[in-house]
Structure formats: C-alpha cells, structure tokens
Amino acid sequence: MCNSLNHTLTCREGSLPLGAATVRVVLTTVCVVLISMAFSACRPSGDKGRIPAAAEIAPILLFNGAGVSPGDVAAVEKILSSEHLNDSTVNSPRLNGMSESHIRAYRLLIVPGGNFEQLGDSLTASTAVNIRNAIRNGLNYLGICAGAFFAGNSPYNGLNLTSGLRFEFYAAEARGIRKAAVAITAGGQTLDQYWEDGPQLTGWGVVMAKYPDGTAAVVEGTFGSGWVILTGVHPEAPASWRRGMDFRTSVNIDNAYAATLIRAALNRELLPHY
C-alpha cells in the first residue's frame, strides 16, 4: 500500500556504510521494486477517463439511475445472479459522462421499469444520442416497461429505436387499472405476468408475446447492428409484488421467462414468435 513509499524513501545510498558495495546493490534493487509497487498501489482504480478493456468489464450494463424502480433493479439483478451473468450498474450522472465507445464496450444494456418521464429527463440529449449510436453499432438492448417506453419515440429524450413509433399504454390503463396479473401468450404457452402501467408494443419488431386483446406484449427486432427486446410486462417480478393478485403461473416459471429474454438479448437469439 502507500505506506511502503515512506519506507522506500529511507533507502538512500548515503545511509549505507562505506565499502558495503554488495549490500548497496541489493538494497538499491529492493528500493526500486518497492517504489514501483507503491506507485502501482496508489494508482486510481476507477475507469474514469478511459475505456476499460473487455476483460475488465461485465458483459451487461444495468441502468439504476433516476426514474427506475430500485425494486425492479434488484429483481433484475436476482435473475442475473441466478443465471450466473455478471453486470455493472450505472446511474444517470455516470451514464451522462460515458462516450458512445465506452457504452459500446458492453454487450447488453438493460433499462428496467419505473417512470419513463423521469428516466428520460435524467439523461442529456447527447447521452440519448450516444446510447442510440451504440445500439446502432452493435450494443444489444433490453427494455422492461419504462425501458420499453424509453426505447420508442418518447418526448423525454427517447432513444427512437422504432422509426418514429411512440408506444401507448396497454388497454387496461384506460380502464383505470394500474397493476394486474395479465395473461400473455408466448411460445405456445400462456403465462400470467405482473403488469404495471406498461406499454403495448404493436407496430414494431417481431411479436413474441401478446396481451389478451391481441396487442404486442413482448417484441424483438434490430436497430442497425444492435439486437433489441422490449417487454411491457415484468417477468422478473418477485413473489412480493403478487400480493392481492391471482396468478395461475408460478413465480419461478415467470422468472425463467425473464431469464430467457435476458439471454436472448445478450446472445442475439430469435425466440418463437407470431
């Protein structure tokens, strides 16, 4: 550590007895090694101002900044942990300070649920451009609920990965329902999913799952060289979110579907679709 530097400063050649040439050579060598170690130990460990090498970073960048639900960040992290997938979290100020190339050093950006207006407003217009360009040039993207709204042509610094399409809320919102267990059909099976003020995604990408009214609940597509998956429901939702609701699908099955979406986004896999 840095204390070793103070020790090396006492290793001056003039402090050695005259005629101790051999000892002088040995101690001088030790001093050089200790000084080198000291400066290495004192070097800042952060990645500010540089793009980390691929071996230094996790493959997944998880946004946990303003507007996203801390509970949903925790839910996503639990799925990632169960799948043995490493991630790094990034808040709004840090993401605002990242260049396109820095963002693109990751393989997948996940933006969880929350308030898409606050989320977008916490980021600068140039940051939205950097994210958009990173996706165009190969970064993959998974948007969950608010993250899906943010991917569209949102007036709140939206990424507009959708050629101008702005997503609307799923029809339950117009009936005054704010959260519910909603049955989606995906891959030939019916899954009861936790829904809370999420979008319907009709009009963009390939439809992988549908709401009961036939509108798109989960879609998949590309933007430039980037692979994009958007979901209006929360398959990652923990059991605690289900209180007071009736689900016919177990939380383990729903969470397994969340893991499927994450891996598909990470590995650029086309899932069963309509």
Please tell me what each predicted stretch does.
Residues 43-45:
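Bacterial signal peptide processing site
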Residues 62-155:
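Helical hinge/lid and interdomain linker segments adjacent to catalytic or ligand-binding clefts
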Residues 49-55, 132, 158, 235-274:
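Extracellular ligand-binding/catalytic regions of CAZymes and related secreted enzymes
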Residues 67-68, 115-116, 148-150, 166, ...:
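Short, solvent-exposed loop/turn segments at secondary-structure junctions
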Residues 173-242, 273-274:
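Catalytic beta-strand/loop cores that center a nucleophilic Ser/Cys/Thr
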Residues 136, 152-190:
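Class I SAM-dependent methyltransferase SAM-binding "motif I" and its flanking Rossmann-like core
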Residues 38-41:
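C-terminal motif of bacterial Sec signal peptides marking the signal peptidase cleavage site
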Residues 1-23:
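N-terminal secretory signal peptides that target proteins for export/translocation
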